[in-house]
Amino acid sequence: GDPCISSDSLNGFEYFRIENNNMHLSMNTNGGAQDVEWWKELAIIMGRKGHVTFSFDGLSDTNHLYRQGVNWENCMKNSAAFISKGGRARWEFIIFDHNQHQIEEAKELAKKMMFDDFRTKKTGRFFSTVKHEGKESHQGMNRKGQETQKLEKPKDKYINSALKKEKDLVNKYGSMDHYYDVTDINCKSIEKSEIFVTAEGHVF
């Protein structure tokens, strides 16, 4: 569901910008698709009232382990092209066992490339939505249903704090299923008065 794959993305962003010059535009991407000219044009359309979050989970030797099929050189060229035209870029780094040793190096690279921000993200992938319990690893799958990279949980300090609450929630509610049934869900898009387009094309 990467926005840059869609042939309508640039036209869509341009439409929003023409309709409302004060609207803040943003998107998340793995940055591996399209050419540098596409990214330069996106930066010009967005201007300073917008940003792109580039999901780079590691460096040249590790990013592809989670971002399957994504070419690192393309990621670097595309993000650099976006920044070169004044685009505001954020680097978001999901922490796994295989890349946790590269956080500081990636942070320095982001600074050198003039990213506006570098953020680490503690993933919630080490929780089984089927068994409703924590797990030590996450098996990656490709589009053909074949197993790919097995992702291992990072060190304790990099584990999503929400995963540590599992036992407390079970003790309080009896089960995770019951917790889901009685917990209120707050929509971030409503709270921030945003329009959010999902990978399936749903608009909220």
List PLM regions with ranges.
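Radical SAM enzyme [4Fe-4S]-AdoMet core and its adjacent flexible, acidic
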Residues: L10, E14, E19, E41-F204
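His-Asp phosphorelay/catalytic-motif detector in bacterial-type signaling
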Residues: N21-M23
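A short, conserved beta-strand element in the Rossmann-like catalytic core
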Residues: P3-C4
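Short beta-strand->alpha-helix junction loop in the catalytic core
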Residues: N30-A33, L59
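Short acidic active-site motifs
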Residues: D8, E37-W38
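Conserved hydrophobic beta-strand within the GNAT/NAT acetyltransferase core sheet
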Residues: L25-T29, W91-F93
